[in-house]
A protein has these predicted regions:
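Small/polar residue-rich beta-strand/coil "junction" motifs that cap repeat-based extracellular fibers
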Residues: 1-18, 22
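C-terminal intramolecular chaperone/auto-processing assembly modules
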Residues: 8, 15, 59, 63-109
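A generic structural signal for nonpolar/aromatic side chains embedded in well-ordered alpha-helices
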Residues: 16, 27-30
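Stable alpha-helical elements in mature extracytoplasmic
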Residues: 23-26, 83
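Functional cleft and adjacent loop/helix regions within the main domain
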Residues: 30-40
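Short, conserved beta-strand/beta-arch hydrophobic-aromatic motifs that form part
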Residues: 45-47
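Active-site-adjacent helical/loop segments in soluble small-molecule enzymes
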Residues: 53
Length: 109
């Protein structure tokens, strides 16, 4: 591990697959929330509800919330990587639309 972050070295990973699927439609299913923890009320936090994420990205949900005293957690690094992928898709789409718009403007003179 490195200070301030987790280990991300390729040499520590197996079955690496770059995400080529379109992510943006699935990202739209995530529901950001603001909330307070019951045990630490008074401090507003931002994040997601694990049970909501479970519907779209079960692989990002940690723990066993089904057990009597179990709770769910989230792999926020995983959510971040999907968010970056979605942002990349959006940038490429905007660039394509800008190019098409400029081509139409040029045709109209």
């Amino acid at each position: 591990s490195t200070p301030g972050g987790g280990t991300s070295d390729l040499r520590r990973k197996i079955n690496v697959q770059y995400i080529n699927d379109e992510i943006t439609p699935h990202i739209l299913n995530l529901k950001p929330v603001k909330f307070e923890y019951k045990d630490y009320s008074g401090t507003t936090r931002h994040g997601f509800i694990a049970q909501d994420v479970l519907e779209t990205y079960p692989e990002l949900v940690l723990g066993d919330g089904e057990k009597e005293n179990g709770t769910y957690g989230l792999d926020y690094d995983g959510i971040l990587s999907l968010t970056v992928k979605s942002l990349q898709e959006t940038i490429l789409r905007v660039e394509k639309l800008e190019k098409e718009l400029n081509e139409l403007k040029n045709k109209l003179g």
